[in-house]
Design a protein with these regions (language model features):
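Short, surface-exposed beta-edge/turn micro-motifs
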Residues: 3, 35-36, 148-150, 165-166
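N-terminal winged-helix
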Residues: 69-88
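Conserved beta-strand termini and adjacent loop/short-helix elements that scaffold enzyme active sites
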Residues: 22, 74, 96-98, 145, ...
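N-terminal segment of the mature folded domain
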Residues: 87-160
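Short loop->beta-strand "edge-of-pocket" segments that line small-molecule binding or catalytic clefts
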Residues: 66-75, 160-174
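Short, solvent-exposed amphipathic alpha-helical segments in soluble enzyme
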Residues: 9-12, 85-89
């Protein structure tokens, strides 16, 4: 096999360097612009496992990489907006959209600084029950950055019975 180099965003969480690789495939041109490093995947491996150490080559100054805020979890346009505002202040927020539960797992494992989430519990409460379940004794701060109303949009007037007979296109992953 051949060694492979994968573009990634890197940041320092507590005392560990964390790399978040960009997905392979379409859109790679923007990955070059947004990446902070290249990760080396050895020739004898197809991929790296989560948490596995590897060599990385920084493409930004070390001091910049140390100040990156890694945000992993649900995709929320508000985070993108905040990242744009932070950039003007010299703060780089790098987000990866993996879904609320995967974001909480990354936060628990120390792989990110922040985890956007929107999880509705069986009792109708958002987020707090999941934090209590997965972070029992740890000190966390839950910041509500906004509320939103979501729905299903259609060109035709539909009722709930029509949901079974129509096709829907889901949003992006995360």
């Amino acid at each position: 096999g051949f060694e492979e180099f994968v573009q990634a965003i890197v940041g320092k969480v507590q005392d560990k360097w964390i790399a978040v690789p960009f997905p392979r495939g379409a859109g790679r041109q923007m990955h070059v612009v947004r990446s902070h490093a290249f990760l080396k995947v050895p020739a004898n491996k197809k991929t790296l496992k989560t948490g596995e150490a590897t060599d990385a080559h920084l493409t930004v100054p070390h001091t910049m990489a140390e100040q990156v805020v890694l945000v992993t979890g649900s995709h929320d346009p508000a985070i993108d907006y905040l990242a744009d505002l932070a950039k003007d202040a010299g703060i780089h927020i790098a987000s990866s959209h993996v879904g609320s539960m995967n974001g909480l797992a990354a936060l628990r494992q120390g792989f990110c600084h922040l985890a956007p989430m929107h999880l509705l519990s069986d009792d109708g409460e958002y987020n707090t029950p999941y934090l209590k379940k997965h972070f029992s004794e740890e000190e966390l701060v839950l910041i509500c950055i906004g509320e939103r109303i979501q729905g299903i949009v259609s060109k035709e007037i539909l009722g709930f019975d029509d949901i079974l007979t129509h096709r829907f296109i889901n949003r992006q992953k995360g």
